[in-house]
Amino acid sequence: MCSSDLAEREALQSTLDGNSVELLLAFTQALRRARRIFIAAHDFSRFPAGYLEHRLLSLELDCCILDLQARQDMFRRLSAQPPQDGLLIAITVPPYGNDTIALTRYCASIGMPVAALTDRPDSPVARCAQTTLLCHVELMGMTNSFTSMVGLVDTLAMLYTFTSGAPTQEEKTCRDTLHRKFDSCFSDPNTSI
């Protein structure tokens, strides 16, 4: 095993050891309570944010990554429902993005629950979050490892499923039937004149 693989494994182990089961369950409860989940991330954090979105969508949760550059679109999405029905998941590691921090502060100020995936308890987004999970992301003195965040996302998805938050088989069957009917509406050749 090469030294970088060992370092990645140690980073993941450190992350899993540093987050209690209670913290992980609190994060999954926040997911369960939210009608809509918003994910904010920038630069390095966008990869784990995309993976988190993929995993949450596979659990049939309503979520989206916010485009931090499209402020009017962000505002439209965030204001489409009462703030208490949403959840902002802020993902940030050094250098912390000003837009991610500003959005986190805004959501906290309007009463939207905030959860954070970050590297330190004193990170700017952790100060605004009700639930914070810490990830070891530094290898060889640089922020360059997202293995621990991806591992933590997988852990959260499994916990969500194991704590009965995932759709039942009956719900999945009904959704699959609706999906097939939806697809069949578009399977006929276009007959418009």
Language-model regions, residue ranges each:
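A short, well-structured juxtamembrane/interface segment
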Residues: 15-33
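Glycine-rich phosphate-binding loops that contact phosphosugars or nucleotide phosphates
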Residues: 35-151, 155-165
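Glycine-rich phosphate-binding "P-loop"
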Residues: 7-16
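Hydrophobic packing residues in well-ordered alpha-helices of helical domains and bundles
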Residues: 5, 24, 49, 171-172
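Short, small-residue-biased leader/transition segments that mark boundaries at the very start
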Residues: 1-3
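Bacterial carbohydrate/catabolite-sensing allosteric modules
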Residues: 32-34, 58, 65, 183-193
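A short, charged, Gly/Pro-tolerant segment at domain boundaries
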Residues: 166-193
